[in-house]
């Protein structure tokens, strides 16, 4: 895979005004990996492993999967920063990224991305199993090639299909424990797939002017609030229904069942509130961001319940 390097024109576009110290340089490399995105992905990994094992897996397997998964996500994030550095300098939300400020050069970022990606696959392959390694390759490929290079600047549905990369950690986690991909893993994959639009589209509403300036067709930048809110509601309904399929098909117990139902109902209400405000032309950045942050809370609650579930009670069905 060859990534074309866009020319840097100023110090802010990739030529640091002075040499950074070790601590500052390390901080810049960490920022390249998009640690907030990485944290969110890792929230799903350990609970999925616990649920797959119906208990606590081997500690070394947990470490290999978590570290390998984190490095894979970090590699994908760094590749994304490298490719998108031309539009990152236009958008206020991304103007402090290391390649924009010049804290890291494009060459350094590209070498770092490849090194981290190769290391991540090696850790997953040998620390877990080859299937986990192959799924790690698929995750990086989908985020870098399918989302960043192909979809992001071409379609308002970019994060729908590009979001597949964000679903891969649950498949990697399940495969690490069982050496196969089974129906419960596919259900969890679909939950995150359906969760992605209600998570990102409210954010695109908040930063619609940024995306317009960068000519990135995020739905919140190219469609009105009413259209976006309808899509958020529809995807949220599908997500909640999908999450409940884990009860009959994944042998979920009482903790997961209660939390999936209650958290799902709460997030549905938030999605419908957004739609109601959009319908009355009273939607604000604050109300859009409330749904964005609510989506993170929902996913966190769901996967915490998934981790606790095997230790409490018996499966309700199956």
Swiss-Prot record:
Give the domain of life: Bacteria
EC numbers, comma separated: 2.5.1.141
Report any one BP term from Gene Ontology.
Answer: heme O biosynthetic process
Q: Which CDD domains match?
A: PT_UbiA_Cox10 (cd13957)
Q: Which InterPro entries match?
A: Protohaem_IX_farnesylTrfase (IPR006369), UbiA_prenyltransferase (IPR000537), UbiA_prenylTrfase_CS (IPR030470), UbiA_sf (IPR044878)
Enumerate the UniProt keywords alphabetically. Cell membrane, Heme biosynthesis, Membrane, Transferase, Transmembrane, Transmembrane helix
User: What does the UniProt entry say about where the protein is found?
Assistant: Cell membrane
**Protein name in UniProt:** Protoheme IX farnesyltransferase
């Amino acid at each position: 895979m060859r990534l074309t390097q866009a020319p840097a024109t100023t110090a802010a576009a990739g030529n640091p005004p002075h040499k950074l110290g070790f601590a500052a340089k390390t901080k810049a490399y960490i920022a390249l990996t998009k640690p907030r995105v990485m944290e969110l992905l890792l929230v799903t990994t350990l609970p999925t492993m616990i649920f797959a094992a119906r208990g606590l897996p081997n500690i070394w397997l947990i470490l290999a999967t978590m570290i390998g998964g984190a490095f894979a996500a970090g590699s994908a994030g760094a590749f994304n920063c490298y490719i998108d550095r031309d539009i990152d300098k236009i958008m206020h939300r991304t103007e402090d990224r290391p390649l924009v400020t010049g804290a890291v050069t494009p060459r350094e970022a590209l070498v770092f991305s490849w090194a981290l990606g190769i290391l991540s696959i090696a850790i997953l392959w040998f620390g877990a199993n080859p299937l986990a390694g192959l799924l790690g390759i698929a995750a990086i490929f989908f985020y870098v090639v399918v989302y960043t290079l192909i979809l992001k600047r071409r379609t308002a549905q970019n994060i729908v299909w590009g979001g597949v990369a964000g679903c891969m950690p649950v498949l990697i986690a399940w495969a690490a424990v069982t050496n196969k991909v089974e129906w419960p893993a596919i259900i969890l994959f679909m939950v995150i797939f359906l969760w992605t639009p209600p998570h990102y589209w409210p954010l695109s509403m908040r930063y619609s002017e940024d995306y317009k300036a960068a000519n990135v067709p995020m739905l919140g930048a190219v469609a009105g609030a009413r259209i976006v809110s309808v899509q958020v509601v529809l995807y949220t309904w599908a997500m909640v229904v999908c999450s409940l399929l884990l009860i009959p098909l994944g042998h979920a117990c009482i903790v997961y069942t209660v939390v999936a139902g209650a958290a799902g109902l709460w997030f549905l209400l938030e999605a419908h509130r957004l739609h109601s405000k959009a319908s009355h032309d009273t939607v604000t950045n604050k109300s859009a961001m409330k749904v964005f942050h609510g989506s993170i809370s929902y996913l966190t609650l769901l996967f915490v319940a998934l981790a606790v579930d095997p230790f409490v009670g018996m499966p309700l069905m199956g």
